[in-house]
Amino acid sequence: GDDAYGDIPVNLAQVMLGSTIRVRTPQGKKVNVRITAGTQPEAVLRLRGMGFADRGRQGDLYIRTHLRLPEPGDEELRGKLAELFRDMGMKF
């Protein structure tokens, strides 16, 4: 079979905490994709047998994650984020 490729947007909470996202396969079927906690931006997830069929074989579907960041928000929210990032040992 032939492999298929696609992209999905993920947010910070989804990649840090883990999540399930519904995606559409090339055949139009909707399937759940598990985003595990700690998934890195631009990670490529492989869905075996979800690509294009060719000569009796089924290809795989490869999905790349793209991190979408939220708007910075107000001063209070930025303060909470700064505290969280400091607690995580992040420098900024």
Region locations from a protein language model:
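Intrinsically disordered, low-complexity linker/assembly segments
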Residues: 1-92
